[in-house]
Structure formats: structure tokens, C-alpha cells
Amino acid sequence: MSGQRQRIAILPGKDGSGNRTSSAGAATYKESCDLIDLSSYKEIQMSDDEDVVNSSLVICQAKVTMEELVRYTMRSKNMIPKVVAEFRNITVGGAISGAALESTSHKYGQFMDTVAWIKVLTGSGEIVTTNKGDSLWCSLSGTYGSMGIVLEAALECVPATPYVQVSYYAFDSVEHGIKALLDVVSEKRHVFLDGLTFPPQQVPLQSVEDQNPANRRGTVVMQGEMIGSFEDPPRIQGWKCKVHGGSFYYEHVRDLLNEHFRKARKRNNLKSDRTTVEAFFQEVIYMEDYLFRYDYGAFWMARPMAFEPNKLLSYFPFIICLFIASYRWVRIVTGSMFTTKTMFKILKQAPESVVAKRMVVQDCYIPPETVNGFLSWVYRSIPISTPIWLCPVLFNNNQPFTPSYKKQNQSKPTVSAPVMINCGIYGRVSDGRGAYYTQQLEAMCEQLGGRKMLYAQNHYTESDFWRIFDQTIYDVLRESHHATEAFPSLYEKTCGVAEWKNTWVEAIMSLFL
């Protein structure tokens, strides 16, 4: 490697778990690179380490998926990694490079924060081991392989049970839901924590004069605790991931919330203050089903496509079939289409310009002080009718390219919880202005002191991008780790511009998205 001129990138996987992201530049930068095949890097083993307090380490190679990781650690030691990314086929290398998170992130931070050490292929051709807190370790998360290529990592694990008891708390405004999330973070008692806020099309609420209509959204906060054992399983169990004929998890939560509000309206005693309301529903979910609850349906991106009956005849029959394929009763036959592994395979066949026009898929990390204003703006400005995922994440001050990064000299938050709120905004737009809405999101996110993840469509100018991600620090670190000439830059990897060519392929694919 040290003597060759061609830059290096990872060969995309053939199983749907590969390294091609949905970012606009993902399909182009690898064309000028020599590609390294890591498909055989799938070994896992447990290793006790007395230096890691209250945890054990699992040593796994870069291409191990989250599903393989969880099944191995549960089977070997009844443990799970401290943070498990939400999709079954996300790889360990991808979770590190892409700054993955999930519902334990309020407690442990992002996936990278639970990594004890990493073996990295550097630009000089050496394989080095970097430990937590080292310069290279701090540079890897959020840089998408532009600092070095992850080969192997040691992840911290914690004891686990086979079941999770999930408690659901209902709120009739997003402000109350956010407050509840922050209150739970401050309590530092719960293992799993996230929330969903629903649009009025899915969770209709009665009007209240003294509330901001934009923020009046049915919102649910979910708290999870580990319970039970294989020898003594709970008698009452709840939602299960059933690929054929089962409900998407968000549908299950939405139905619970609607039923709760219906009963509350009937009793005329709906309350919004978390200090006076108890969980309206509890259920027990298998650990694996809970960890990957958003995998089936890709959160809600596989939701049934809505169309007006009077326009039905304007659709071709095969497109009508596509529209109805994701309805629950049809999933008895079509269910296997809606795992993320299959959905991303299909999505990657679509021209990136079509994806940019038709979809808004973004994760924006927003400080607690400004998150309510951010969500109000999203509701007013982006025409999607899907839920928004709310997931608190501990901020860090040593990984400068992650969305959860907070400089040490930044002003202290006015709330007690040391977290950012990840707002997962995933939806389709019918007017073909997805790229415009994404640009507006990028600007608003920065304006309110946040950062977004870079795995999806990005439309930053180069100057705006390097203002946010500090090119001076980035270039110094790239040079010190011999990455400058060896790997494409972070901007090249994530911010290519997709052009709309009006080809017949794009015209047809635009009907599907």
C-alpha cells in the first residue's frame, strides 16, 4: 500500500450488509479506488479483561453483523454489547465508522464509546492497535473509513436476560415527551430509552387552545428493563417480530397510543404531565426482537403507500401491487420484502438522484435546549406524514467528527442531562423536493447547535461542510495517521452531488419511491 498511487476503499458487501451507504457520493468515489475485500472478516470470540470494570469484552472482526454479534454473546455468556445498532445487518466496522446509536445510548453513548480497542489498517499499510482515548481511536468514528480501515474491535458487554419489559408513557405534545426523556436520563436507572412522536394523520388528538399546534403530537416514551431467565420465562409476553403477517413495531406502538387516547378521551381525564401519569401499557419482548425492533420495516420506511382512490386509475397495475404489498394483511405473503437487508438491496438499485428527490432520511443530533424549536420547524416545513424517532445520546468531547461531539469550551447546557437528542426523520415526499428539504434540514440543524449523521443524502457545499467538521483538525489527523494519500476524504465519501438526468430508468424508479 505504501508504494501505490491508487487510493483504498472497502469492496461493497454482496449480502446487503455492505459498505455502500445511501449518500449521494457513495456510488462514485469507489470507482477511482482499489477495493479491499473484507468479506471473510467475520470471526468472534469472548475474552475476559479484568481492566474493564463490570463488563467482558467480545473480540469481533469488521464484517460481523449485529445479529451475529448478539446471538454469539447471548449464547456464550448471556451478555450483550452495551450498544447494539438497530438493524440486524449493520456490521461492526460500519457501526464504528458511521457512529451508530440505539436506546442504550443515553447510558453508554454511541457504539464507539463502548469500544475498548481497534485494529486498524492505516494508510502506510501497517496494522496497528489503537486503544480508547488514543488519537487514532478518537478519529475513527464518524469519518467513514477516511482515517483508516477497521479490521477488528473489542466491544464492552454487560450481563443480559432473554427478555425486556417495556413500559410505555403517553403524552399529547412533543414538549412533554422530550421533558420525560430528559427526566429519565437524569434518573440514571433505566437500561433502554427512546421515544416516538406521531403526526396527526396517524395519532389524531383533540384541539387544545393553549398549545402550539405544530408541537401537539401524540408522543410515546418507551423505557425498557431486562427481566426473566431462560429457566423462568415471563408468563405474559408482547410484541414479536413476525416477518410474515406481523406488525411493524411502530404500528404496534401507534395502535397502543391511539387506544390509550381513545380511552382517556372517553374518561375525559387525559393528562400530559409525566409526574402525574404512570405507564399506560407494559409488555415483555424477547431480547433479540427488542434490539432489532426497527429492523422489520426499516423503522417505517416500508409503511403502506397512501394514494387517493379517485386517482387509482392513473397507476399501472404493477405499481398498485407495489403500493398494497406493505399492508399488514398482504405481508403474510410479501413480508420478507420488508427486512432492512432486502429493502436496502432494492434501494441501492435506484438512481441516487431519484432517492434525493423522493426521500428525506436524516438523523439530526440536537441539543435539548433547542430540540423543541427544531421539531416545530420540521413539522411546519417538511411534508412527511411519518413518525419521528427520539433517542437521547450522551455527548462526547473527544471524537470531533461524531454527531454527538460537544467541544469542552462550549457553554454548558441549561438542562441537567448531558445528552443530545437524535431526531430520526425518515419519510417520502410527493413533490420531488427531497433534496431541497434536506438542505433546509442541514442549515437548521447547524443553526440550532446540532449535527447530523452523514450516512444518508448530504448537500453541503465544501466550505460549509468543513466549517462544521473542522477541516484544520481533520487534515492534521489525516496527515499524522498517513491517511491523506491513501483514502478518499470524508467530504468525497459523503457529499457527492447526484445529477438528475431524466433517464427512463429514473422516471420509472421515481414512481416506486
Task: Label the predicted regions.
Residues M1-L513:
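Noncatalytic alpha-helical scaffold of FAD-dependent oxidoreductases
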